[in-house]
């Protein structure tokens, strides 16, 4: 590969004036610092840091655990974390077309006490910058801004909650770190020194961090004389006043680093100055090679003058391993010398940001109506998976800015007039402001948006006349129904089709309005009378049902569900799921989809399939149960849909899926450690205990298993899927005779044999679940000598072999006493006699003792460990450094 270099020497008479204390254009943000606290100067650097409260619309503040405080600088002590939403963004005012050094610092410091390391994505605008997966890292990038605003976004990708400690921006000269294309992502930056001192501002006017780099095969060279540093790169005097040469004069001076993936392109910057006084008969001359190929030279450094050897085109290393060598020439009497080196990988940000006018327009709309939707952060249109709720965009080419084509703010609680900010959305095709409380007149500027095809203003409190320009606009559909004060005073509210026939567009006669209101009042009175006569009591016994041959119930015989929760129409379900766009999973009931209620509340929508083995009876059972049970460890019901053949249950959204996914590793690459597993089963047990003891009459779940333990964004466990649940209808009743239902492997043998259902049937199933989290093995495995997990564990226990029982991925990182107690508890739950099984109250008590025993060993383990082993060299508060050879 051909490589080109430029030589920059500072032997010119003009020396650039370094203003060490100048922070002009610097943005230094202490994330998590209270808005009430004044800006402060950091003791080590003198840099002025301010609170982030005005730069971000979401998140909560935190602080590192006390044991970490002595290890970090003041700006790193606090942080902001984001438990809500998927994307949370900082909005920064910058100068367009300016070269910026951007640094984001992430130090976990066990701020939440959970010992769960980070794993989330970092975006600049709509483009992925990097993935944060280390407990302690500084991400750095050099880029040229495209506009006067910059958004730094933290995007949740799994179970860990995004956080950030510090955000810093430093403007740089345009002729620094020039690339053919793309931006420069920091790989390493080192100065050749055997000290442990890190160098940054004020020594470095751009606040670059220089880390010492040295090898035992080198000799340290220093000078007290002033070294003229590079005009272009303005290197610190303290960096260029030190260098190294090989101890053996004929040896090469090597710097080694790796890049991933191996095809990654990079730029290197080698900084050299002669800082030794050479005698008349001494010569220092060398070449520079990369992986054995000549790249620059021969070169003789000039005394006390800095030269920077810079790549003009990006390089690449075979296999991703790079070895830069400074090699003495035959002519040279002295060994090669090196002062400092930097390297960056090339990162492309191909996705253009949304059209600037559209962004300004939608933000003005947001500000006018005070919309605080959690998803309305970052770029409105891209990336597509983070599209703002209620918008549709056109993004035909990543090199062209996306445009907003549809805005749906229906049922969003809007008040006031229709804002003129909408007219800035000049590419809008569909505008839906229906079912709000908008007042004032229909504005004429809507007719000026040439692209508009559909305007839905129905269900508001608008008044006055519809502008003729709107009525006369060809090809546009206008709906203003449900606005009783709109009148057509400027001629007929009729617009002509292109074929010349007339069609009513808006008809709101006063007489019709009065008649409609009268009919509605009459219907409402009749409905209330009938409801009073026919409504069954929620707490009463369920009525008997006539079963149809296909397992579903004749709809005519099914009583209505009485609920204070919200009942949704099927069309609302379609809207909330964005036409069933995102599938969360599939069960016996049917498909489960992701959705939003009121534009902000995430929900999971379970749709009953017509081919489902579960029918209306189970649907109704689940709704009626969830209406009368409320517990932090039971999944909450947001609402339901019961419209014709369309049945749906709308639950609170559980962002981290089910326990089975995490145990099997299909959800992500993290493994739950023993303490986290205990916490999850304790919370699940508390939910069951509430069903057994907190409900009147008591409830039996009948289908306790790992797929029915759901985890929210805070990793709190909640019991789900109550379609098979049954209650004891008579006070004091100890069992109920039922048709056997449940999941094979989890099913209580006594219940299966007798058809007698008790709370102890749930206890048996919970014991199986407990063995699953202990062993991480299948409940039924025909390859084992004893296929059923309970029998297999029993055999292993007779041998005293608990190591073979435990999940090997835990790497024996647990308290043995805690484990033994949990295993014994699980086996007691599996007793063939239900009378000898513990109650769920006893189970909760014993599990808490297990957790206390685990916590007492000093918290030596992390809650989650990576399955993959990544070999990196890290020190607290630093980045990955290259190896000196």
Swiss-Prot record:
Pfam families listed in its UniProt record: LRR_8, Malectin_like, Pkinase
Alphabetized UniProt keyword annotations: ATP-binding, Glycoprotein, Kinase, Leucine-rich repeat, Membrane, Nucleotide-binding, Phosphoprotein, Receptor, Repeat, Serine/threonine-protein kinase, Signal, Transferase, Transmembrane, Transmembrane helix
Catalysed reaction equations from the record: L-seryl-[protein] + ATP = O-phospho-L-seryl-[protein] + ADP + H(+); L-threonyl-[protein] + ATP = O-phospho-L-threonyl-[protein] + ADP + H(+)
Residue positions where Phosphotyrosine is found in the record: 651, 751
Membrane-spanning parts: 510-530
Domain Protein kinase: 578-851
Compartments, record wording: Membrane
Protein name, as recorded: Probable LRR receptor-like serine/threonine-protein kinase At1g51820
Natural source organism: Arabidopsis thaliana
């Amino acid at each position: 590969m051909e490589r080109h270099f430029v030589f920059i020497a500072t032997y010119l008479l003009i020396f650039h004036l370094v203003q060490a204390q100048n922070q002009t254009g610097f943005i230094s943000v202490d994330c998590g610092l209270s808005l009430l606290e004044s800006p402060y100067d950091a003791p080590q650097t003198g840099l002025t840091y301010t609170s982030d409260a005005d730069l971000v619309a979401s998140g909560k503040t935190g602080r590192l655990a006390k044991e970490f405080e002595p290890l970090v600088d003041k700006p790193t002590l606090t942080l902001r974390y984001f438990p809500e939403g998927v994307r949370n963004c900082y909005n920064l005012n910058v100068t367009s077309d300016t070269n910026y050094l951007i640094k984001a610092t992430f130090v976990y410091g066990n701020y939440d006490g959970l010992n769960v390391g980070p794993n989330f994505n970092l975006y600049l605008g709509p483009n992925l910058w990097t993935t944060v997966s280390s407990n302690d890292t500084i991400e750095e990038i050099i880029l040229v801004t495209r506009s006067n605003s910059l958004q730094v976004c933290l995007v949740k990708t799994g179970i860990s909650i995004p956080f950030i400690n510090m955000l810093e921006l430093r403007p740089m000269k345009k002729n620094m770190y020039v690339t053919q294309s793309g931006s420069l992502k920091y790989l390493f930056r080192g100065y050749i020194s055997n000290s442990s001192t890190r160098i940054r501002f004020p020594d470095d006017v751009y606040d670059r961090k220089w880390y010492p780099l040295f090898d035992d095969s080198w000799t340290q060279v220093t000078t007290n004389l002033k070294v003229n540093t590079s005009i272009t790169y303005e290197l610190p005097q303290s960096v260029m006043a030190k260098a190294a040469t090989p101890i053996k004069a004929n040896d090469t001076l090597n710097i080694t680093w790796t890049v991933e993936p191996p095809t990654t392109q990079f730029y290197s910057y080698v900084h050299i100055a002669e800082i030794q006084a050479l005698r008349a008969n001494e010569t220092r001359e060398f070449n520079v090679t990369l992986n054995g190929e000549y790249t620059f030279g021969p070169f003789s450094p000039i005394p006390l003058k800095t030269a920077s050897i810079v790549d003009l085109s990006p390089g690449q290393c075979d296999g991703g391993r790079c070895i830069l060598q400074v090699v003495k020439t035959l002519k040279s009497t002295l060994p090669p010398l090196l002062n400092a080196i930097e390297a960056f990988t090339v990162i492309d940000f191909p996705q253009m940001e949304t059209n600037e006018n559209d962004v300004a327009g939608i933000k003005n709309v947001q500000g006018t109506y005070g919309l605080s939707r959690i998803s309305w952060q970052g770029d409105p249109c891209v990336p597509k998976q983070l599209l703002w709720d209620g918008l549709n965009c056109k993004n035909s080419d990543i090199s062209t800015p996306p445009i907003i084509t549809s805005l749906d703010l229906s049922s969003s609680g809007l008040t006031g007039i229709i804002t003129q900010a909408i007219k800035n959305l000049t590419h809008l095709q569909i505008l839906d402001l229906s079912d709000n409380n908008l007042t004032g007149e229909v504005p004429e500027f809507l007719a000026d948006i040439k692209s508009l095809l559909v305007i839905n203003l129905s269900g508001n409190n608008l008044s006055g006349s519809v502008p003729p320009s709107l009525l006369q606009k060809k090809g546009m559909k206008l709906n203003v129904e449900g606005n009783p004060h709109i009148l057509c005073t400027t001629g007929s509210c009729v617009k002509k089709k292109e074929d010349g026939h007339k069609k009513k567009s808006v008809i709101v006669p006063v007489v019709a309005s009065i008649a409609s209101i009268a009919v509605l009042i009459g219907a409402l009175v009749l409905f209330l009378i009938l409801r009073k006569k026919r409504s069954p009591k929620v707490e009463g016994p369920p009525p008997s049902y006539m079963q149809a041959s296909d397992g579903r119930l004749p709809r005519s015989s099914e009583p209505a569900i009485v609920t204070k929760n919200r009942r949704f129409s099927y069309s609302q379900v379609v809207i909330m799921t964005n036409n069933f766009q995102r599938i969360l999973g599939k069960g016996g009931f049917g498909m489960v989809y992701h959705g939003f209620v009121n534009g902000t509340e995430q929900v999971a929508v379970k749709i009953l399939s017509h081919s489902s083995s579960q029918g209306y009876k189970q649907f109704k059972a689940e709704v009626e149960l969830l209406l009368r049970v409320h517990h932090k460890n039971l999944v909450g019901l947001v609402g339901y849909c019961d419209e014709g053949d369309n049945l749906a249950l709308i639950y609170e959204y559980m962002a981290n899926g089910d326990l089975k996914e995490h145990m099997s590793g299909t959800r992500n690459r993290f493994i739950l450690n023993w303490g986290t597993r205990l916490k999850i089963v304790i919370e699940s047990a508390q939910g069951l205990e509430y069903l057994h003891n907190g409900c009147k009459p008591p409830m039996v779940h009948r289908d306790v298993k790992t797929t029915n333990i759901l985890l929210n964004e805070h990793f709190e466990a909640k019991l789900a899927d109550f379609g098979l649940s049954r209650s004891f209808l008579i006070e004091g009743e100890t069992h109920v005779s039922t048709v056997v239902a449940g999941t094979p492997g989890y099913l209580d043998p006594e219940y299966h044999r007798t058809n007698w259902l008790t709370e102890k049937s749930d206890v048996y199933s919970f014991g199986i679940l407990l063995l699953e989290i202990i062993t991480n093995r299948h409940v039924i495995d025909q390859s084992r000598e004893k296929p059923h997990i309970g029998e297999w564990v029993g055999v292993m226990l007779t041998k005293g072999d608990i190591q073979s029982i435990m999940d090997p991925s835990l790497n024996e990182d647990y308290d043995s006493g805690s484990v033994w107690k949990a295993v014994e508890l699980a086996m007691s739950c599996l007793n063939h006699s239900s009378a000898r099984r513990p109650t769920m109250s006893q189970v909760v008590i014993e599990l808490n003792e297990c957790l206390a025993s685990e916590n007492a060993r000093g918290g030596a383990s992390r809650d989650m460990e990576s399955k993959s082993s990544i070999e990196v060299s890290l020190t607290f508060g630093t980045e990955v450094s290259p190896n000196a050879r």
